[in-house]
Amino acid sequence: MTDTHGTFIPTADLVDIIGDDVRSCDTQFRNLGGRTDFHGTITTVKCFQDNALLKSILGEDNPGGVLVIDGDASLHTALVGDIIAGLGRDHGWSGVVVNGAIRDSAVIGEMEFGCKALGTNPRKSSKTGAGERDVVVSFGGVDFTPGHYLYADSDGIVVTENPVKAPASN
């Protein structure tokens, strides 16, 4: 897969390239989007059981970007559904990582959009706009810093300060 951010490098290969200093997320997310492999520049939002702020962010054009959503690991309400995921896809986002729940998983699973989340819950979240944007969020032993780079695939998530160039093949 290639996009405006260059060639995707599988996370296992990134670990081999980077070595012991790798920033690999320990949290075991479920792949719920139609794209398992996705990557891009990180934008963050911290919100608890409220998705109005993240919806407005995904409504902004961000070709190849990845929104990291820290919902404090709550599975009580869904932060992303098919409408919000479709909004992100339509504005060029590569995908989302949700430290929380989503809903409409069957529809999201058919979208050309990356989505990793802890699980699902059909319950809607509130819509007050509470939350913080572009702050460092931390989970799974990794700090997700706005402007840094995220690679996600079926093996997990790796975060780097900048995109990694694939080594030349022999």
UniProtKB/Swiss-Prot annotation:
Entries under Pfam families matching the protein: RraA-like
- What residues bind substrate, as annotated? G81, D82, I83, I84, R103
| Domain of life per record | Bacteria
Cofactor annotation comment: Divalent metal cation.
Q: Which UniProt keywords apply?
A: Lyase, Metal-binding
Which Enzyme Commission number(s) are on file for it? Answer: 4.1.3.17, 4.1.1.112
Q: Which reaction does it catalyse?
A: 4-hydroxy-4-methyl-2-oxoglutarate = 2 pyruvate; oxaloacetate + H(+) = pyruvate + CO2
Requisite cofactors = a divalent metal cation
* Transit peptide keyword on record: no
Positions annotated to bind a divalent metal cation: D104
Q: Which InterPro entries match?
A: RraA, RraA/RraA-like, RraA/RraA-like_sf
GO MF annotation terms: 4-hydroxy-4-methyl-2-oxoglutarate aldolase activity; metal ion binding; oxaloacetate decarboxylase activity; ribonuclease inhibitor activity
GO biological process per UniProt: regulation of RNA metabolic process
Assembly mode: Homotrimer.
Q: Please give the function described in this protein's UniProt entry.
A: Catalyzes the aldol cleavage of 4-hydroxy-4-methyl-2-oxoglutarate (HMG) into 2 molecules of pyruvate. Also contains a secondary oxaloacetate (OAA) decarboxylase activity due to the common pyruvate enolate transition state formed following C-C bond cleavage in the retro-aldol and decarboxylation reactions.
Recorded hits in PANTHER family, A to Z, give: 4-HYDROXY-4-METHYL-2-OXOGLUTARATE ALDOLASE 3-RELATED (PTHR33254:SF4)
Q: Which family does it belong to?
A: Belongs to the class II aldolase/RraA-like family.
Kindly give the NCBIfam families that the UniProt entry links to this protein.
NOT-MenG (TIGR01935), PRK09372.1 (NF006875)
Protein name per UniProt: Putative 4-hydroxy-4-methyl-2-oxoglutarate aldolase
